[in-house]
Amino acid sequence: MEWVEIDGSYGEGGGQILRTAVALSVITGKPVRIHRIRANRPNPGLRPQHLHGILALKELSNARVKGAKVGSTVLEFVPGRAEPKHVKVPIKTAGSITLVLQALLPAMAFIGGSFEITGGTDVPWSPPVDYLRNVTLFALEKMGLRAEIELKRRGHYPKGGGLVTGSVEPWESKKPLVALEWNKVDSFAGISHATNLPAHVAERQAKSAEERLREFFNAPVEIETEVSRSLGPGSGIVVWAETDSLRLAGDALGKRGKPAEVVGREAAEELIEQLTPRKAVDRFLGDQLIPFLAFAGGEIGVAEITNHLVTNVWVVERFLGRTFEVEGEIGEPGVVRVVRKAEV
């Protein structure tokens, strides 16, 4: 058996290497061995939140897995016969639902299936669920991929308890994505939420974001507010720009002692920063699209070439050979081009 060998400490050196590598193992049918997992981190090895994505992909592909335990620095994943199924992922804590989806979505695109994931929907260090639903899926649909993500209940740090369900149809017609620059912003939209908190929190976040965006752009702004109940309190906001190309976004989370006005303004300022280079893809979407672009083809202009993006390109090319050309330095705007489209 020939392994694809991956150094888990390369580049960004975190959970993303695991998510992308195991997803590509499922897609290509190639077994993968990842060693030196998170070797440069204060607490090396697999963390609980990484296991959820790995085990979900194990179930989807009937894989044989060795080393899938907390603290393990080596993981061996041998995919079996993948078939569409309903995958349940119960994250007992506020572990990120969207990071599990970053592993599941590319794999399910080639197989089909549905999912039900409990955990954190709006938690630090991961994209909020409203980002995936409104920005990521919007771009994937342009590439011919049909997927649905439904938010049933919010989950915040530390209690979690969020619930997300959805499905992915097998990706039959892959369309190249050419999205280099935007020429005009048609409008702004967003979702501002408050969970187990007064409605005025969501309203103030939305108002503050809207005011900030209007200082820079003369375009309509429509941010909806959502008030709900869950296991614990929390708030957040995602705002996105509808451009003549794709959607770009900014987001922010509330926390105790942080005024709602500051939360709203932070999200708006992050979005303005993403729009400034006039590239079609924001820095967060850039790295998420890499596994899909490899099979669909195309080229994208990104507001910032991140370490995550470069690391994702490296992982994909371990499986598929040279696929991409990246123009631009880390921390700067740039272009990612597919030079050789992969077939499965």
UniProtKB/Swiss-Prot annotation:
The EC number on file is 6.5.1.4
The primary location reported for this protein is cytoplasm
Q: Name one Pfam family in it.
A: RTC_insert
Please state where this protein is localized. Answer: Cytoplasm
What biological process terms from GO does the record include? RNA processing
Q: What PROSITE patterns does UniProt report for this protein, alphabetically?
A: RTC (PS01287)
> Which transformation does this protein catalyse, written as a reaction?
a 3'-end 3'-phospho-ribonucleotide-RNA + ATP = a 3'-end 2',3'-cyclophospho-ribonucleotide-RNA + AMP + diphosphate
Q: Which CDD domains match?
A: RNA_Cyclase_Class_II
Give me the Gene Ontology terms describing cellular component: cytoplasm
GO molecular-function terms, A-Z: ATP binding; RNA-3'-phosphate cyclase activity
- Family that this chain belongs to: Belongs to the RNA 3'-terminal cyclase family. Type 1 subfamily.
Described by its record, this protein's role is as follows: Catalyzes the conversion of 3'-phosphate to a 2',3'-cyclic phosphodiester at the end of RNA. The mechanism of action of the enzyme occurs in 3 steps: (A) adenylation of the enzyme by ATP; (B) transfer of adenylate to an RNA-N3'P to produce RNA-N3'PP5'A; (C) and attack of the adjacent 2'-hydroxyl on the 3'-phosphorus in the diester linkage to produce the cyclic end product. The biological role of this enzyme is unknown but it is likely to function in some aspects of cellular RNA processing.
The protein's name is RNA 3'-terminal phosphate cyclase
Organism encoding this protein: Thermococcus gammatolerans (strain DSM 15229 / JCM 11827 / EJ3)
Q: Which gene encodes it?
A: rtcA
